[in-house]
Swiss-Prot record:
Part of the nuclear pore complex (NPC). The NPC has an eight-fold symmetrical structure comprising a central transport channel and two rings, the cytoplasmic and nuclear rings, to which eight filaments are attached. The cytoplasmic filaments have loose ends, while the nuclear filaments are joined in a distal ring, forming a nuclear basket. NPCs are highly dynamic in configuration and composition, and can be devided in 3 subcomplexes, the NUP62 subcomplex, the NUP107-160 subcomplex and the NUP93 subcomplex, containing approximately 30 different nucleoporin proteins. It is a peripheral membrane protein. This is Nuclear pore complex protein NUP96. It comes from the Eukaryota. It is found in: Nucleus membrane; Nucleus, Nuclear pore complex. Disruption phenotype: Pleiotropic phenotype with diverse growth defects and early flowering. Residues 283-295 have a biased composition (Polar residues). Expressed in roots, leaves, stems, flowers and siliques. Its main location: nucleus. It holds the Pfam family Nup96. The modification Phosphoserine is found at residue 523.
Length: 1046
């Protein structure tokens, strides 16, 4: 590694140029004593710094001057800075109390790192002393400042990673002078570990190679690695710690059992110290030379590796056996025997992080942020494993890190009963029944091609005439769900709210059948229904349709608030019948209000109540009467306040009438429609008027049902949510306009306190889109949320059905492919074990190749290679099928004599052999074997003219050559059994070849056949047998040759 000397950069030099003394930093203040009678107090309040190569800003002289000018200045020094020449500096942000700080022991700069408060026991709490936010600048010693931009960017990236891993914030890296700048919230130790320094090609020399002083001369590096304060290993890195033992106890036992050994070590320690201190007096000594000098006397202690700890608030004093860290590293501790703690890691309440108005002890969140090193992670189906406190636990008791908690996201809460158990009936009524109804509706299919495959994306189509029947069908399903035993109160509340939503959809978006539609429907049975058609068509008045819809909405609103009216009335206990009347009017229960007024003898008020919400003339008359009373100075103290409020309400002044009352948003909307706006106002005008008052903060917010009618059982976001009923009203009033509230409208919080429940909202969205209320392709959160719910209950087929209804987008063309394939692969065991689901998925038009591929991966994972092979063949993954056939299937079938199955599988891939790598050296080997074996057996059994032995031998030689080449190509991928199968094939072929050598009397040809056998991968015993036969044949050949020669 190239050595480098960096000249003192201007920033640090400028900070250090005020230093008058380079050897002693605690200056004499005799001259200053005359300036102030409290000189002794000032001297005692100053920080102490004796290290020759450290500097301060403001310097000691400036601190004295400012302390004289402004008493207690040292308790509030702005932007206090301390640094070491050639190593870096720290600028503490804000005002810092530096009184009586022993800076020599508190701040230590080393090569590529800085340590503040080495001793954890003396470190103050965060925010006090020097344990506060600061900006750190370290000098990074890179080997060559002339590197290119790519290398510099690599170093900057490594530094940024190291900074963020230690809980600090990376600011900048200046390659011109090697300055690494970052922000820290508090202190222990920050810098680069040994491994990180090696990764970014740091220089091996300690410090800055040879740090440069202010006078241009090199300063000796007095680092902690060269001082004997680190001569002994930390207990956390000792052998007992790696063996799972308590190093403190082992140290204590060693001291008790071998006291003399400690004295010997102390003697060695002193000798080693003397030797090393002598070596430190030599300047510009290479690191290798220093090590050589140490080794000349005694081997140095091994290098201590510092591994990161994951938690920022970790106190190393709590667990002596934990490894050190670059994040909150355990520093060198005294080796005095201490009593070790037997418990696990605990997070002290004093070290928690304040969040808004409370404290967080979310070890789980910290674990998920820091990663696997903190032993936390997600499993399938929303399972979380961690070592922190249970998520919903309210206990203040600390937890041990050795306790692993398993928790699961309640994505299936909608099918729980009051005891928190899943009920099959709820699964059917919440998921399967609504989806079955959705599937029965008319659909249009859009075929979209993805390469060689295609999907049939679906969309529901319907019209507003049949919307009423669809809504009634959904309501019937919900009513059956309400009959399930064991439902919690909150579950019943949400189900009733779903009924209200479907009723409102029917009121706002359905249409009555026109005359033309009735005539078309009657054409098939004209004689029977023509009279009914005429009667129905006579009743339809197009101009009256808005008023009919308004009346239906009024009835819906009366029904939805009736229970709130009864609750308010029951709270009165008959104390005031006027308040009773007022509450009845908020729900438009005019009949009951009139009867109550009559029963109390208030006949005139009953007459006014009977006309409430009617003609605006009556309202104006009451309003004029109230104005007349006020103008004439009527003393309203003689009239009940409740009666005045009734008059105000009847006059249309709903805000004056509601001064002392708090009502829900639906009743306020009703008062606006019934008593304030004209009786012929259309619904869009009513909804917009309410929205205008809402924007002016003059109307109650349309809060969701779980806030409006009681505390929610689950998690409730702090954001201001609105009820889906309100969004339906906005959607009706803005059908011809642009609207941007769909994301919020179809969020889970618009109808339930469960942020993961989308099971009914998805149907709302689908039906509203089908009738043309809106069109959107940006509601993927809704779709995927519902998919996750279905998958949590094992309803994979319905999950795929929902995916097919996601609108196609050009910017995400492969969204459907990705999601469907992920479902098939991840939940293969579920859908493949149920024939009904498998058939349902096929009927949806999902490519069978995807299903076979998922099954192949599943069977391969579980070691069922025969089934995996069949599935890979079915999905036309020929290369993968061929690989499994050769490495896992073929040899087992061959050794079990299942030759017909081998032939079937091999021939099924033979047509695609051009797509398969090494086919001739793979499955082609088996096919060649059977063909060659069959040919040799036919030659031996038939009486026809035999094939010449030369030709047969050549065929066998080619086969043997391919066997050997196949073994070389497949190598270690072939198990021992496959090699046995190869030996069996070679043995059978060689036996057939050598079984009848008499068909060719030529001894040379016969010996050539033996050469073929010797090249084959035969077992040694078989090879020995053939060798004996070959020797016999060769002897015979020699004898025959001798006879001929004689």
């Amino acid at each position: 590694m190239t050595s480098l000397s960096i000249q003192p950069f201007p920033e640090i030099s400028r900070m250090a140029r005020d230093l008058d003394s380079r050897k002693k930093r605690r200056i004499s203040l005799d001259g200053i004593a005359a300036l102030c009678e409290h000189s002794k107090e000032i001297i005692d309040s100053l920080p102490m710094l004796n290290s020759p190569d450290y500097f301060l800003k403001p310097c000691i002289n400036e601190l004295v001057e400012r302390e004289i000018e402004s008493p207690d200045y040292c308790s509030r020094v702005p932007d206090f800075t301390i640094g070491r020449i050639g190593y870096g500096y720290i600028r503490f942000l804000g005002n810092t109390d530096v009184r009586r700080l022993d800076l020599d022991h508190i701040v230590k700069f080393h090569r590529h790192e800085v340590i503040v408060y080495d001793d954890e026991s003396s470190k103050p709490v965060v925010g006090e002393g020097l344990n506060k936010a600061a900006e750190v600048t370290l000098v990074v010693n890179i080997p060559d400042l002339t590197w290119g931009k790519q290398q510099v960017n690599h170093i900057a990236y490594k530094l940024k990673q190291s900074t963020e891993r230690q809980g600090a914030t990376f600011i900048s890296f200046d390659p011109d002078n090697g300055l690494w700048k970052f922000f820290v919230p508090h202190f222990s130790r920050f810098g680069l570990s040994d491994d990180e320094a090696e990764d970014i090609a740091m220089d091996d020399a300690p410090g800055l190679g040879d740090p440069v002083g202010l006078d241009g001369k090199k300063v000796a590096d007095i680092d902690e690695e060269d001082q004997m304060e680190t001569s002994e290993l930390e207990l956390s890195h000792s052998l007992p710690a790696h063996l799972g033992l308590d190093p403190e106890k082992m140290k204590e036992m060693r001291m008790l059992m071998f006291p003399n050994e400690d004295e010997d070590e102390s003697e060695d320690f002193r000798e080693q110290t003397s030797h090393l201190m002598t070596s430190l007096t030599k300047r510009n000594v290479r690191p290798s030379q220093k090590i050589a000098q140490r080794n000349s006397h005694q081997d140095p202690p091994p290098v201590v590796r510092k591994t990161p700890l994951a938690l920022l608030e970790y106190n190393p004093g709590n667990d002596k056996s934990s490894p050190g860290s670059i994040l909150m590293v355990q520093q060198n501790k005294n080796l005095a025997v201490r009593k070790s703690k037997t418990g696990g890691f605990e997070l002290d309440i004093s070290h928690v992080t304040p969040l808004t108005d409370n404290y967080s002890r979310n070890v789980v969140d910290a674990a998920l942020f820091m990663g696997r090193s903190f032993r936390a992670g997600w499993g399938p189906n929303g399972v979380l494993f961690h070592t922190g406190k249970p998520i919903c636990s309210s206990s203040s008791q600390m937890v041990l890190s050795s306790v692993i908690n398993k928790e699961k996201i309640a994505i299936d809460k909608v099918v729980w009963d009051r005891k928190g158990k899943v009920q099959k009936e709820l699964i059917d009524s919440a998921f399967e029944a609504p989806l079955s109804l959705h599937k029965e509706l008319n659909h249009v299919e859009e075929e979209v091609r993805f390469g060689s495959f295609s999907l049939k994306l679906q969309n529901v189509v319907t019209d507003r005439v049949v919307l009423s029947d669809i809504c009634r069908s959904y309501i019937g399903i919900i009513e059956k769900q309400l009959e399930v035993a064991g439902l919690s109160t909150s579950a019943k509340l949400f189900l009733m709210h779903q009924v209200m939503v479907w009723e409102l959809i029917k009121v706002l978006f359905s249409e009555r059948q026109s005359t033309e539609r009735l005539m078309y429907a009657a054409s098939d049975n004209e004689e029977d229904v023509m009279q009914d058609v005429k009667e129905d068509s006579a009743k339809i008045d197009t101009e009256a349709l808005p008023l009919i819809r308004r009346a239906e909405f009024s009835c819906w609103l009366q029904e939805s608030v009736s229970h709130r009216v009864q609750e308010d009335v029951s709270d009165l206990n008959g104390s005031s019948y006027l308040e009773h009347l007022f509450f009845l009017l908020t729900g438009r229960e005019l009949d009951s209000a009139v009867e109550l007024a009559i029963s109390k003898g208030d006949v005139r008020l009953a007459c006014l109540l009977s006309q409430a919400g009617g003609s605006t003339v009556n309202r104006n008359d009451i309003l004029q009467q109230l104005h007349l009373w006020r103008r004439n100075g009527l003393d309203f103290n003689f009239i009940e306040k409740e009666r005045i409020k009734l008059y105000e309400l009847l006059a249309g002044n709903i805000h004056d009438a509601l001064q002392d009352f708090t009502i829900d948003w639906k009743r306020f909307l009703g008062l606006l429609m019934w008593h304030h706006l004209p009786p012929d106002s259309s619904l869009p005008i009513i909804f917009r008027s309410y929205q205008l008052l809402l924007n002016q903060a003059k109307a109650p917010w349309p809060v969701p049902i779980y806030i409006d009618e009681g505390p929610a059982d689950g998690f409730v976001s702090d954001n201001k949510h609105s009820d889906i009923l309100y969004y339906l009203m906005l959607l009706h009033s803005k059908e011809e306009e642009e609207f941007g509230f769909l994301q919020t409208m179809f969020s889970a919080f618009s109808s339930t306190d469960d942020p993961l429940d989308y099971h009914m909202i998805w149907h709302h969205r689908g039906i509203l889109e089908a009738v043309g209320a809106f069109t959107s392709d940006d509601l993927h959160t809704l779709d995927m949320g519902f998919v996750a719910q279905l998958l949590s209950q094992g309803l994979c087929h319905w999950a795929i059905y929902v995916v097919l209804h996601i609108p196609f987008r050009e910017d995400h063309p492969y969204l459907h492919v990705t999601v469907i394939r992920e479902i098939l692969f991840q939940y293969c065991e579920t859908w493949s074990s149920m024939e009904s689901q498998r058939q349902f998925i096929k009927d949806l038009g999902i490519p069978s190749e995807w299903m076979h591929e998922a099954l192949a991966v599943y069977y391969n994972y579980h070691g069922d290679f025969v089934k995996a092979l069949d599935q890979f063949i079915e999905c036309a993954n020929w290369q993968r099928a061929h690989s499994i056939f050769m490495t896992s299937v073929a040899h087992s079938l061959f050794l079990s004599a299942n030759h017909s199955e081998i032939w079937r599988i091999a021939t099924s891939m033979d047509d695609r052999k051009s797509e398969i790598e090494n086919w001739d050296l793979g499955a082609g080997i088996y096919m060649s074997f059977y063909l060659l074996k069959s040919s040799l057996q036919e030659d031996a059994d038939t009486m026809v003219e035999l094939e010449p032995l030369d030709s047969t031998n050549e065929s066998c030689r080619n086969f043997v050559g391919r066997l050997n080449e196949s073994l070389a190509v497949w190598g270690d991928r072939l198990p021992v059994e496959a090699r046995v199968a190869y030996s069996k094939m070679a043995e059978e072929i060689c036996d057939l070849l050598l079984s009848d050598l008499s068909k060719n009397p030529s001894r040379e040809t016969q010996l050539t056949c033996f050469e073929t056998a010797f090249d084959a991968p035969l077992p040694e015993d078989v090879r020995s047998t053939h060798l004996q036969d070959a020797v016999s044949l060769f002897s015979l050949y020699l004898s025959e040759t001798g006879q001929i020669s004689a």
